[in-house]
Amino acid sequence: MSGKAQQQSRLKELISRGREQGYLTYAEVNDHLPEDISDPEQVEDIIRMINDMGINVFESAPDADALLLAEADTDEAAAEEAAAALAAVETDIGRTTDPVRMYMREMGTVELLTREGEIEIAKRIEEGIREVMGAIAHFPGTVDHILSEYTRVTTEGGRLSDVLSGYIDPDDGITPPAAEVPPPVDTKTAKADDDSEDEEAEATEDEEEAESGPDPVIAAQRFGAVADQMEVTRKALKKHGRENKQAIAEMLALAELFMPIKLVPKQFEGLVERVRSALDRLRQQERAIMQLCVRDARMPRADFLRQFPGNEVDESWTDALAKGKSKYAEAIARLQPDIIRCQQKLTALEVETGLKIAEIKDINRRMSIGEAKARRAKKEMVEANLRLVISIAKKYTNRGLQFLDLIQEGNIGLMKAVDKFEYRRGYKFSTYATWWIRQAITRSIADQARTIRIPVHMIETINKLNRISRQMLQEMGREPTPEELGERMEMPEDKIRKVLKIAKEPISMETPIGDDEDSHLGDFIEDSTMQSPIDVATVESLKEATREVLSGLTAREAKVLRMRFGIDMNTDHTLEEVGKQFDVTRERIRQIEAKALRKLRHPTRSEHLRSFLDE
């Protein structure tokens, strides 16, 4: 029997035993595992898979009562299938430790999307966003904020695309691709380091792309309708209150008009944060009340969760608890002022927002459901297009970033593409996403690949210079001079020289040299600041000769010369400083110095130093 078959047989036996006795112990699992699996994380993964099959794994054998809760299942076919799956996973785990291969393996389990699948996911994303917008519309102040932002950009000369991204109309048809231009992308940064695509990128930059944002006329109609309905809703709320049927109908009509408006992420997140902020304040006070009741007053948690909902701002609720006959009534009475203080903060929140506590929770619940729906759909779209990122990232290897870093940056661009994808344009998602992925990768290379960061605009200039330099090399058969490059690029010569200097890549001094790699680049570079051994030896000999000559003078004369010329000292000294040291006048020091120098000039003493002077 082969090793793999024997391994599968042992795993089958393990699973069958687990199904028969209703459990397994860690010791039994360990005995049946292959010897090459020793990593704790791998063992945990296998135990998790066994648990997923309905077999509990315990430290030791459980008692009989616990076993009665589990039903034994001895299906032979199921045991064989589970053993085969477990063996395959174990083999895979044992072999693969490379993160790239593990990533590729996980990526390969997701099927590619068809055009219909992309549209279906895009519609689910839009539906989730519509639900969020519909919930947000019921929160006071959100619609007014967006209307004020729209008024600001239209009256102060701002860009409509700073507020509005588009519209989400489920009934709109899909435009044929021929009727549309390719999806707009900020291509100024998408061409930073791709020599083969420089010309195309620069052509795109030269044609200053007109902003293809929302149509101002349609935006005026939509926001005008929302503003009119907002005014009607405000009057109905003021006249009848939020619980009146007419007011509810007007609010639903406002939400229907507000839902199709697709805001830019910054504005959308701002509205969501408004709702979350109110809910966070609400939760904070609810937690404080629960701690007072459950932790401090020893009220059973189940009792609190049953009685508190609906009584968040009812101060008589604590009176009833305090006057009750429960064990915790006395403690509640003692803590009643603190509980009422928290309830008053909740009441202030209701007054501030104009909503009841239950309404704030309901708005947040509907908003969270819509966000979760959109998030799940976006996750599906991203996972189904990870292969596209790999195919694009492969073209940018060996440019200063690791392959996994390129994949990561490309995935960030892919997520941006999912956020901005408009299936109604008629293009497949891959056509649209390619530009965003390439933009993210090239921008990251420009920002991160070099040890010394160079701005993106300078990277573009360097790439253009390199391309023109190669063209001129082919035309002339030699490297062009800076003057010739400046003439071709219509740039001053000094700027060309500056760009050429900036374009140089730094290299490590520890770069190995030679086949054996036993020496480094730094070993071959001259250190101009280092003194040669001969100079060092000469200086040391001069010091010794000077000390020997000075030893032939009197102690006073030698010290005066040492201080005046800074010999064996940090610095030299003036006549006045030396005079203070000896407590004599500066004239006397000058005389001592002159006498000492005359002695040193005598041939018997000066011959020791004259050889150094000749050198």
Swiss-Prot record:
Cite the residue spans of the region called Sigma-70 factor domain-3: 460-536
Disulphide bonds annotated for this chain are: none
Return the annotated region ranges for Sigma-70 factor domain-4.
Answer: 549-602
* Subcellular localization(s) per the UniProt record: Cytoplasm
Biological processes, Gene Ontology terms: DNA-templated transcription initiation
Q: Where is this motif: Interaction with polymerase core subunit RpoC?
A: 405-408
Q: Where is this region: Sigma-70 factor domain-2?
A: 381-451
Where is the stretch described as Disordered? 166-216
Listed A to Z, the keywords are:
Cytoplasm, DNA-binding, Sigma factor, Transcription, Transcription regulation
Fetch the InterPro entries from UniProt. Answer: RNA_pol_sigma-70_dom (IPR014284), RNA_pol_sigma70 (IPR000943), RNA_pol_sigma70_r1_2 (IPR009042), RNA_pol_sigma70_r2 (IPR007627), RNA_pol_sigma70_r3 (IPR007624), RNA_pol_sigma70_r4 (IPR007630), RNA_pol_sigma_70_non-ess (IPR007631), RNA_pol_sigma_70_r1_1 (IPR007127)
Q: Does the keyword Membrane apply?
A: no
Please indicate which superkingdom the organism of origin belongs to.
Bacteria
Q: What is the annotated quaternary arrangement, including any partners?
A: Interacts transiently with the RNA polymerase catalytic core.
Q: What is this protein called?
A: RNA polymerase sigma factor RpoD
Q: Which organism is it from?
A: Pseudomonas protegens (strain DSM 19095 / LMG 27888 / CFBP 6595 / CHA0)
